[in-house]
Amino acid sequence: MKFFCKLESGSSLPEYATSGASGADVRANINEPIAILPGQRALIPTGISVEIPHGYEIQVRSRSGLASKYGVIVLQSPGTVDADYRGEIRVILANLGEATFIVEPGMRIAQLVVAKVEQVSFVETQEELTATARGTGGFGHTGEC
């Protein structure tokens, strides 16, 4: 399957690092380094716009190396790029680490994962919902954090 991309000057196509990778790396399309202080966030351009076919989305996810080594994650991960969006994909990076993180021009900053999606009809009901073993147990309902 082909997804057509429009590239701004200096940007490059998303790339899969290995033949088995689910996510394609995207790079920072910036001219100068950007410093993200601890506890802060920054919106980083990729220079990529994508024509996503109907029935698909692109999920923007953190790179595990940035998260584990520096505490830098994609905020609102996964971020969703809808099929009808035609603008530049930009990545919100958050620094949860203890040191300032420098985003360098061309640095791999996130991964794009393609996923199938389906729109459904949400229908209000006055009836009880079907019972399950979990029931209404929400966050931490298993007692494990």
From Swiss-Prot:
Biological processes per GO annotation: dUMP biosynthetic process; dUTP catabolic process
Residues that hold substrate according to the record: R63, S64, G65, Q76, T80, V81, D82
Stored InterPro entries: dUTPase, dUTPase-like, dUTPase-like_sf, dUTPase_trimeric
Disulfide bridge positions per record: none
Gene designation: dut
Family of the protein in this entry: Belongs to the dUTPase family.
Organism listed in the record: Chlamydia trachomatis serovar D (strain ATCC VR-885 / DSM 19411 / UW-3/Cx)
EC number in record: 3.6.1.23
GO molecular function, one term: dUTP diphosphatase activity
Coiled-coil region list: none
Signal peptide interval: none
Protein name (record): Deoxyuridine 5'-triphosphate nucleotidohydrolase
Pfam families noted in UniProt: dUTPase
Record function comment: This enzyme is involved in nucleotide metabolism: it produces dUMP, the immediate precursor of thymidine nucleotides and it decreases the intracellular concentration of dUTP so that uracil cannot be incorporated into DNA.
Requisite cofactors: Mg(2+)
PANTHER family per UniProt: DEOXYURIDINE 5'-TRIPHOSPHATE NUCLEOTIDOHYDROLASE
Pathway the protein contributes to: Pyrimidine metabolism; dUMP biosynthesis; dUMP from dCTP (dUTP route): step 2/2
Keywords for this protein: Hydrolase, Magnesium, Metal-binding, Nucleotide metabolism
UniProt catalytic activity: dUTP + H2O = dUMP + diphosphate + H(+)
